[in-house]
């Protein structure tokens, strides 16, 4: 347990609709222990924002064009951000791209790529360019606030500005703005893996956003507006 952990009540009143500083050691950068870390999940297809020993660990399945996913970030993003910062919560983001069509200019895939660019590869990243989980959560909130369902979505340059505004390192913003392909994941394989995992959680009501409690191995009821407060107080 970390000093100063306290329960954070969810302040959002919106009920979500249908679920549909680092030290250099031997040339390798290590995350700043005073900041919530950011890392790839063990399977390589998720992005973990938060301390690995946070008492509440969840997965969040989300699609960049899903309006209900935007509603979740709008309603709960601030509380998620604070809880990550306090060490109470760690979120494994699992992006999906099933809403991409020929008319969307790979909207969802490009946003997912930007998310994985934010993580980078620690062995290839100097200490000035390590992202934190807190910065990443802010980036997620900004991206989903600027979604364009059914359209091409934000440009690479617009996403780079969001990354910069979220506090992510300049190196990350530059890579996003250049439209660089993330070297730590294959977006197509990631989307297929995460969709399969989502079906495994709920093969009947399969949709986004879906929150999965890694502690209880249960899907969280997002129709309960107090779902986050309940998790943090359990």
Give the residues covered by each predicted segment.
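Structural alpha/beta surface segment adjacent to cysteine/selenocysteine redox centers
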Residues: 70-152
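Extracytoplasmic thiol/disulfide redox context detector
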Residues: 2-103, 188-192, 196-200, 228-234
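Active-site-proximal beta-strand/loop segments in catalytic clefts of secreted hydrolases
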Residues: 61-63, 94-97, 142-144, 213-215, ...
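Charged/polar, low-hydrophobicity segments characteristic of intrinsically disordered regions
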Residues: 148-165
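Alpha-helix initiation and N-capping motif
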Residues: 77, 136, 156, 169-170, ...
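C-terminal cap of thioredoxin/glutaredoxin-like
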Residues: 24-25, 160-234
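A structure-centric signal for secondary-structure junctions around beta-strands
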Residues: 55, 111, 207-208
């Amino acid at each position: 347990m970390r000093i100063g952990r306290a329960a954070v009540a969810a302040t959002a009143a919106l009920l979500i609709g249908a679920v549909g500083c680092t030290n250099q050691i031997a040339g390798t950068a290590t995350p700043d222990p005073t900041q919530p870390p950011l890392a790839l999940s063990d399977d390589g297809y998720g992005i973990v924002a938060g301390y690995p020993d946070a008492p509440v660990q969840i997965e969040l399945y989300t699609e960049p064009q899903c309006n209900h996913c935007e509603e979740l970030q709008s309603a709960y993003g601030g509380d998620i951000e604070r809880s990550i910062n306090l060490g109470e919560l760690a979120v494994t983001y699992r992006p999906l791209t099933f809403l991409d069509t020929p008319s969307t200019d790979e909207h969802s895939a490009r946003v997912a790529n930007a998310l994985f660019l934010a993580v980078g590869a620690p062995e290839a990243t100097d200490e000035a360019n390590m992202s934190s989980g807190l910065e990443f959560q802010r980036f997620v909130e900004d991206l989903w606030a600027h979604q364009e369902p059914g359209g091409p979505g934000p440009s690479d340059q617009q996403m780079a500005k969001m990354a910069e505004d979220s506090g992510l390192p300049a190196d990350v913003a530059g890579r996003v703005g250049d439209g660089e392909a993330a070297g730590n994941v294959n977006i197509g394989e990631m989307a297929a893996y995460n969709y399969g995992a989502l079906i495994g959680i709920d093969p009947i009501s399969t949709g986004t956003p879906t929150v999965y409690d890694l502690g209880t191995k249960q899907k969280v009821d997002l129709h309960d507006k107090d779902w986050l407060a309940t998790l943090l107080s359990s």
